[in-house]
Amino acid sequence: MHEVFEIRPRGNRPGFVVKAREIDYQHRTVRIVTADVDYVFLGAGSFHTTRLLVEARAKGHLPKLSGKIGDGFGANGDFLTARTGLTDDYGPVQGGPGYGRFYDDDFPGGPVSMVYHSTPLPYPTGKLLTTNLIQVFSPERGTIDYNRSTGTAELNYPFAEHTSILDRRGNSFANHFARRAGGVPIVSRLAGFGSASTYHGLGGVVINQAADLNGAVRGYDNLYVVDGAFMPGEVGLVNPSLTIAATAERTMDRFVATH
């Protein structure tokens, strides 16, 4: 496995020098590897793609990067909850997890979606609980910033649990759904539910801000982003994987067409 830790411009012609640690399964460094490349496509995941660029800018390795690098990090509106105390039989529970999604366009404050998962536990335990991923629209965005005291990038998300827009809307919908469909919503943090989650953290090198519409990172030719860092914090009440894949494919199609 390799862990990239440094990206610098190549001095004599366009391109980059990339340094990485080759590591074993205990995360011990085996050796340092250096690659001399014409193009870099960043796909380390939203946080780590952004972290590499934030640290490179702060350390002077890539000083021309946009000041918007690190901005616009969101949780995709994800809010995890569960229901128990169900009175109706909802079918077999040992073939799952079952999956379904629905949208409520009439919910106050804007539409909401919810994914239903039947818990894949043996009978009768599996009939005691269903887990649900609620997704809401939220304008709340954090930033990934360089911490000079530690020499690393870190996420700053200044929205408190329970009082954030995301948490309040998610909690409200969990109770709304339970009133309509039955059961008792579980939104306690003690049980691991009831707050925004980072299953789908998105942003940091946002489209048309820190990167252009084609995925090119502003400030440097030949540097591209092809993962969730390109997304603007949320993608509209869905799992973002297909949207990320589609924009990455679009970036590569346009790259091939112009190079």
Task: Give the label of every model feature segment.
Residues 66-178, 201, 209-211, 219, ...:
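FAD cofactor-binding and catalytic pocket of flavoenzymes
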Residues 10-17, 213-214, 220-221:
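Active-site-adjacent "gating/activation" loops or surface patches in catalytic cores
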Residues 3-11, 19-93, 227, 247, ...:
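Glycine-rich loop(s) and the adjacent beta-strand/alpha-helix scaffold that form part
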Residues 182-205:
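Flavin (FAD/FMN) cofactor-binding core of flavoprotein oxidoreductases
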Residues 24-34, 207-220:
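A short acidic-Thr-Gly-centered motif at the start of a beta-strand
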Residues 233-255:
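A conserved FAD-binding loop/helix module that cradles the flavin
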Residues 6-8, 48-50, 140-144, 194-201, ...:
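Flexible loop/turn segments at secondary-structure boundaries
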